[in-house]
Regions:
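Active-site histidine-anchored catalytic micro-motif
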Residues: 2-14, 18-56, 90, 96-203
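Conformational coupling and interaction surfaces
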Residues: 2-7, 25-27, 32-34, 172-174, ...
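Generic, well-ordered alpha-helical segments
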Residues: 46-50, 84, 105, 240, ...
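A residue-level signal for conserved active-site and pocket-lining positions in enzyme catalytic cores
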Residues: 68, 181, 248
Length: 314
């Protein structure tokens, strides 16, 4: 793990989103993470809604000086797809929060990503936990950023799907963008469904987080109660998976997951497989591995990280 004087600089690109909110809080409360910026994208809800939600989470987290920039409102080529059946009409249903006083910066998310990365020493990690539209657009607009991004830690993909039998939501929403990012040559670590479905908020987890007993933990518990209800109704899951926080947890301490370097390609043409991340688990293609694929989660360490971050946000 990094020492506190070696903070990992990150830009969180998100579509809040219940698990996005928890990911932001995890980063905000950890001394080894420096949030350089938060950028928003359409995904779980329209970008207008995800942007407001990001501002609300920043206020709970005390991120008053972190710029929040609104990004792409639709995929590169396809029609927009959102997930009100999981995240509610607001994109973050459940907790009742006042309108945020924090404002978006005027700069577009894509321009902000480009500016921050080019001005850096090559030490910024991108953490996209929604569709990859903003990241792909930044690479298209300014290819020089590719050599200056330290790493991209993606929540998305998997060896099975949750939007179609083949495709996970974040990749399916904008597979063309995902293909650009996965083929960029930038170091990529993928937190797919194989990993995130191990991050289940059980009743014991919720009880532990509730005992923190501050504004941030109360907010998280309310998120989990709503998220748990929709996951049970939609997928039959007894406990909701907290997908996006896995990406932040890895950035805090990579030992929280076990990874394997594998070949991953994004399908953009298939009639039944659009948006699939084809993970060459057994090396049958003979193609060069290009992604660190997370396969196993240290659940105790993961939830302890979240608890500790919430305690710091009191």
């Amino acid at each position: 793990m990094l020492s506190t004087n070696q903070k990992r600089k990150v830009i969180i690109d998100c579509d809040p989103g219940h698990d996005d909110a928890i990911a932001i809080l995890l980063a905000a409360g950890n001394p080894n993470i420096e949030i350089v910026a938060i950028t928003t994208v359409a995904g779980n809800a329209e970008v207008e809604k995800t942007s407001v939600n990001a501002l609300k989470v920043c206020e709970i987290a005390g991120l008053h000086d972190v710029p929040v920039a609104r990004g792409a409102g639709q995929p590169l080529f396809r029609e927009r797809l959102t997930a009100p059946d999981i995240h509610g009409e607001s994109g973050m249903d459940g907790p009742q929060l006042p309108a945020p006083s924090k404002q978006l910066v005027e700069e577009h998310a894509v321009d902000l990503i480009i500016r921050k990365v080019l001005a850096s020493d090559g030490d910024i990690t991108l953490i996209p936990v929604g569709p990859l539209t903003n990241i792909a657009m930044a690479m298209i607009r300014e290819p020089r950023i590719k050599s200056k991004i330290a790493e991209i830690v993606i929540m998305g993909g998997g060896m099975f799907g949750n939007t179609t039998p083949a495709a996970e939501f974040n990749i399916y929403v904008d597979a063309e963008a995902a293909k650009i990012v996965f083929e960029s040559g930038v170091p990529i670590t993928m937190m797919g469904l194989d990993l995130t479905h191990q991050a289940l908020a059980t009743p014991d987890v919720i009880k532990t987080l509730s005992a923190v007993n501050n504004k941030a933990s109360t907010f998280v518990v309310e998120l989990l109660q709503f998220f748990g209800k929709t996951y049970l109704e939609k997928f039959g899951f007894p406990h909701p998976p907290i997908h996006d926080a896995c990406a932040v947890a890895y950035c805090i301490d990579p030992s929280v997951v076990e990874t394997k370097r594998l070949r991953v390609d994004v399908e953009t043409k298939g009639e039944l497989t659009y948006g699939m991340t084809l993970v060459d688990l057994y090396g049958v293609t003979g193609r060069e591995p290009n992604v660190n694929v997370a396969l196993k989660l240290d659940q105790e360490k993961f939830w302890d990280m979240i608890k500790r971050s919430l305690e710091q946000l009191s």
